[in-house]
A protein has these predicted regions:
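Walker A/P-loop-proximal flanking segment of P-loop NTPase domains
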Residues: 1-71, 78, 83, 229-244, ...
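Conserved P-loop NTPase mechanochemical-coupling segment
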Residues: 27-34, 113-153, 174-186
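Intein modules and their embedded homing endonuclease domains
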Residues: 56-64, 74, 82-89, 116-118, ...
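Hydrophobic or amphipathic alpha-helical targeting/insertion segments
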Residues: 67-98, 205, 212
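Flexible phosphate/Mg2+-sensing switch loops adjacent to catalytic phosphate-binding sites
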Residues: 81-116, 143-153, 223
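Conserved P-loop NTPase catalytic core
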Residues: 108-127, 200-290
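Conserved P-loop NTPase "ATPase switch" module shared by AAA+ and STAND
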Residues: 162-191, 214
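Substrate-gripping "pore-loop 1 plus following alpha2 helix"
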Residues: 186-198, 225-230
């Protein structure tokens, strides 16, 4: 509704273009414009801080980020990977976006002089080994190879690459990891034990091989229809990954919406009303925590 008959809401506001497209880690990594408008809210910051602390203080190197569709997990994955990217300009921009200057543990966990080799994979209901191998070859500038690769040889190559002096380390991003798990549960993909092998190898790689899987639901839920013994096996695999919930608080969502909406004209009372609403939401959140 507007103050002038005949005018539409679209005459006043529109959605910023960079908020109208979904992020795809394999296509958007390496692009400066993929970070345009990104907001690193407290939830995202806490995830990075948690990971940095785990990598610094323990031998944990594999993580899952679990949260609802459209929650910003892929965007954070691109920003995080960009902060480790060999491209210095991209790396600097991503670090500023993520405000890593105020996160001292990050540089301890992910030392970055030459850049990390980032291996972005988008999940599908097929072989994770095949897709990860293809992504690794592409990241290293190699051509496609249709020959099958064994789990052990793929993991060995990841570890050897992580030790290569050309890079500071290897970061594997498994976006839509749940699709690989679904394939495993339906016996259309690889044995879920591969994820355990990968995690165990990463734990022995002196912090130079880090794996992040992006999920929409808990690891166990993907295997909920399996038999009891098989579910127990899945639980053992899940135990190798530290799960970090990715659920933005309501005030963070409001801020994101506020950034996404572009208003050409604003009524004089708008700022005061917006501030009152934001304060009310923050107050409600504090009470719910208490």
């Amino acid at each position: 509704m507007t103050d002038h008959p005949g005018e539409m809401l679209s005459d006043y506001v529109h959605i910023a273009r960079h908020y109208q497209r979904s992020i795809r880690v394999d296509a958007d990594l390496g692009r400066l414009d993929a970070l345009t408008g990104y907001i690193c809210h407290s939830t995202a910051t806490s995830i990075l801080e948690n990971m940095a602390r785990q990598v610094t203080e323990t031998n944990q190197r594999c993580f899952t980020w679990t949260g609802p569709f459209g929650g910003g997990k892929s965007s954070l994955a691109v920003a995080f990977a960009s902060a480790l990217h060999p491209d210095r300009n991209l790396r600097t921009h991503a670090r500023n976006v993520l405000r890593l200057g105020s996160m001292p543990d990050f540089d301890k966990a992910f030392p970055n002089r030459k850049g990390w080799l980032v291996v972005p994979v988008v999940g599908k209901r097929s072989s994770v080994i095949s897709e990860l191998n293809a992504a690794l070859r592409k990241a290293k500038g190699k051509g496609k190879d249709s020959r099958a690769v064994s789990p052990s040889s793929l993991i060995n190559e990841l570890c050897q690459t992580a030790e290569d002096r050309e890079y500071d380390g290897v970061l594997v991003i498994l976006d839509e990891m749940g699709k690989f798990l679904e394939a495993s549960a339906m016996e259309h993909g690889d044995d879920v034990y591969f994820f355990q092998q990968l995690a165990e190898a990463a734990a022995r790689a002196n912090g130079k091989l880090v794996v992040v899987g992006v999920l929409h639901q808990s690891f166990a839920q993907y295997g909920a229809r399996l038999g009891t013994d098989t579910r127990d096996d899945w639980a053992k695999v899940q135990g190798r990954y530290v799960d970090l919930p990715f659920v933005a608080a309501s005030d963070e969502v409001v801020e994101l919406i506020g950034r996404a909406i572009v208003a050409g004209r604003r009524p004089p009372w708008m700022h005061e009303a917006s501030t009152a609403i934001a304060d009310s939401i923050r107050s409600r959140d504090r009470k719910s925590v208490v």
